[in-house]
């Protein structure tokens, strides 16, 4: 499993040594660790690591005059020095042989201990910040610079300091440059302040809110004005906070203007806008060739050339190797350098069969050695969605090309529904009916969730077994009322997939991709495979699993255009994941927001007014130099220089209701 990314809010805690031992014994496993400030010297740090169930070791981390960090006290003889505590911890996680106890035994740092914020105040304090949509986690300064350079002046984000545990950084664009303001957290009180400003705030939100109403002014000849106007939203969230994030982004952004515009719709709109330019550079030539036109159910939905499934063992005639199907791979490679998958898996996303493509479909299944087929559609929903490509009767074989196919078992599956889910389902039905939306498939259905078929394929002397799972209650328009049945369905899909992986033949003939299709092969198909992939990440990693629905959908669309076709399907992904995480959390679920999402919305923005006057009084704060040099310190042993001279900024303290609070526009 890929190493967990270290993130400031899940490995640093504002605790003493005694509390650190308590946390590691209660919640940790051998090799788990946390970082804290040293009690004897506030300039230094300590890494507390659990060695055994009843043994906790504390490793002293010394900060030299050069600002470099090391576990060795003598700066002149130490072999490894680090520019940040994050680099230090990552180094010893990657190279455990470099760290030994006094008795000579290796001391292994495996992963940061997970402390549930539901139960521990020190964890709640650190985790609360992550709920902000403008929080960008462990983003380095160089990446913040890259993100903000293309944004307008006044755009800002909040991130974790790479060098100071517990500290945050405001990265903001002003006059075409990016500046970084460090927000320090007092280790004794937990309050926040910007360097140079004596005002301390109880939370990062209150600090940002204050500075968004009062601009920051550079002290000196340049006199640049820094406005915190427009937050740059991030879509990343960790699994244990996903439920609260869903509650925040499902609400209207501005109810007075529109009840339809939510954080989710905003994400989906941005996703659609970003997809259009990218697709101009990806070829779909093969699917658009006249010879292949009749093989496409919808003429405008064809695969990319670089990810299409190419049928082999075909005659050398134009179009003979074509099928409207695309690979979608959740695998770690150079292609996925910005995405890490803890659970690697592959799919084939394809359209519902036409009568003329059934033979091609089964040739593909055989060629790829796919053993599981997922069909989230009926054959007909007002019109044909998919031609029946499996035998109509049990134990009566059909022949498609050189493949003989027999359905040996057909079983209807119905899952029991809890009273809680029934109540939620009835409420959702009532809400939709009130809006004139009648979910016929679920409202009037017979309660059958899906059909499981066992199919036997024969080609020559070879025989293979296939499982097909056909989901029956996905409504023709929209999405299921409740994710409960879909989640159970996907559990059974994974069970069948694991069954085939466990067979002895899998060692010599590995199981191929799961085949998923609806009608067009993009809407329900995309929703199912993205949901399955994200659920498997959570099951593998746990509550610290990074969740990013936006980036996952963006990623799969590089394999097949339009996967997750509608905003409703995109919202259903959030809804299903939130339901799963809420009902599979081993700790008591505690909401940060308690229905008050405004507390986690971005602060009111200060709009610059032309020709406004400079305030008479201001507070001084400091910012780092607006360049990426400070963020490039990645070597583990190369010497580093001390901090550079930093420009001074002022903060206006006048009332925001008066134009005099706004500073004069600076000369270019």
Curated annotation (Swiss-Prot):
Disruption phenotype: RNAi-mediated knockdown causes an increase in ectopic formation of membrane extensions from body wall muscles and a reduction in life span caused by early stage mortality. Prevents constitutive dauer formation in a daf-2 e1370 mutant background. It is found in: Cytoplasm. It is an enzyme of class 3 (hydrolase). It comes from the Eukaryota. Residues 603-668 are annotated as: Disordered. InterPro entries: Non-rcpt_Tyr_Phosphatase, Prot-tyrosine_phosphatase-like, PTP_cat, SH2, SH2_dom_sf, Tyr_Pase_AS, Tyr_Pase_cat, Tyr_Pase_dom. This is Tyrosine-protein phosphatase non-receptor type ptp-2. It comes from Caenorhabditis elegans. The gene is ptp-2.
């Amino acid at each position: 499993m890929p190493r967990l990314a270290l993130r400031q809010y899940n490995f640093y805690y504002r605790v003493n040594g005694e509390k650190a031992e308590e946390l590691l014994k209660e919640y940790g496993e051998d090799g788990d660790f946390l970082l804290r400030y040293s009690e004897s010297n506030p300039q230094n740090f300590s890494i507390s690591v659990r060695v055994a169930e009843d043994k906790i070791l504390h490793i002293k981390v010394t900060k030299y005059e050069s600002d470099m960090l090391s576990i060795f006290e003598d700066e002149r003889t130490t072999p490894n020095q680090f520019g940040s505590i994050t680099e230090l911890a990552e180094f010893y996680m990657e190279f455990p042989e470099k760290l030994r106890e006094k008795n000579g035994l290796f001391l292994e740092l495996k992963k940061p201990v997970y402390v549930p914020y539901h139960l521990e105040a020190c964890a709640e304090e650190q985790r609360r910040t992550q709920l902000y949509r403008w929080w960008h986690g462990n983003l380095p300064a160089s990446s913040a610079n890259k993100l903000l350079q293309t944004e307008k002046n006044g755009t800002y984000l909040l991130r974790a300091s790479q060098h100071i545990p517990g500290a945050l950084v405001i990265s903001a664009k002003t006059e075409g440059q990016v500046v970084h303001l460090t927000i320090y957290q007092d280790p004794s009180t937990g309050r926040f302040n910007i360097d140079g400003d004596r005002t301390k705030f109880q939370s990062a939100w209150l600090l940002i809110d204050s500075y968004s109403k009062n601009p920051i002014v550079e002290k000196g000849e340049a006199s640049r004005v820094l406005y915190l106007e427009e937050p740059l939203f991030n879509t990343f969230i960790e699994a244990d906070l996903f439920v609260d994030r869903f509650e925040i982004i499902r609400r209207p952004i501005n109810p007075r203007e529109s009840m339809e515009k939510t954080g989710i719709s905003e994400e989906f709109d941005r996703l659609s806008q970003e997809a259009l330019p990218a697709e101009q550079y990806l070829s779909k030539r093969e699917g658009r060739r006249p010879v292949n036109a009749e093989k496409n159910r919808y003429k405008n939905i064809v695969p990319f050339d670089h990810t299409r499934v190419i049928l082999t063992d075909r005659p050398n005639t134009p179009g003979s190797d074509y099928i409207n199907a695309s690979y979608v791979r959740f695998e770690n490679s150079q292609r996925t350098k910005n995405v890490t998958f803890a659970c690697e898996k592959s799919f084939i996303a394809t359209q519902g069969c036409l009568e003329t493509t059934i033979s091609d479909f089964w040739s593909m299944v055989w060629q790829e050695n796919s053993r599981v087929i997922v069909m989230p559609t009926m054959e007909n929903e007002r019109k044909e969605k998919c031609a029946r490509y499996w035998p109509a009767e049990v134990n009566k074989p059909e022949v498609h090309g050189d493949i003989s196919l027999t359905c040996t078992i057909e079983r209807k599956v119905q899952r029991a529904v809890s009273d809680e889910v029934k109540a939620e389902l009835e409420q959702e039905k009532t809400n939709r009916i009130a809006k004139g939306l009648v979910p016929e498939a679920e409202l009037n259905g017979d309660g059958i969730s899906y059909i499981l078929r066992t199919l036997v394929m024969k080609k020559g002397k070879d025989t293979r077994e296939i499982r097909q799972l056909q989901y029956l209650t996905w409504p023709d328009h929209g999405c299921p009322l409740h994710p409960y049945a879909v989640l159970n369905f996907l559990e059974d899909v994974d069970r069948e997939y694991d069954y085939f992986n466990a067979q002895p033949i899998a060692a010599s003939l590995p199981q191929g991709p799961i085949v998923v299709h609806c009608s067009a092969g993009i809407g329900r198909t995309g929703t199912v495979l993205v949901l399955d992939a994200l659920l498997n990440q959570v099951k593998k990693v746990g509550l610290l699993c990074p969740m990013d629905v936006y980036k996952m959908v963006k990623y799969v669309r590089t394999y097949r255009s339009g996967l997750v076709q509608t905003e409703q399907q995109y919202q259903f992904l959030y809804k299903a994941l939130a339901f799963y995480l809420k009902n599979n959390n081993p700790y008591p679920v505690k909401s940060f927001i308690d229905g008050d999402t405004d507390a986690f919305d971005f602060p009111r923005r200060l709009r610059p007014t032309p020709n406004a006057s400079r305030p008479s009084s201001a507070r001084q704060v400091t910012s780092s130099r607006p360049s990426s040099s400070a963020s490039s310190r990645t070597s583990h042993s190369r010497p580093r220089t001390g901090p550079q001279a930093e420009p001074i900024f002022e903060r206006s303290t006048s009332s925001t209701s008066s134009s005099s609070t706004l500073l004069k526009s600076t000369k270019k």
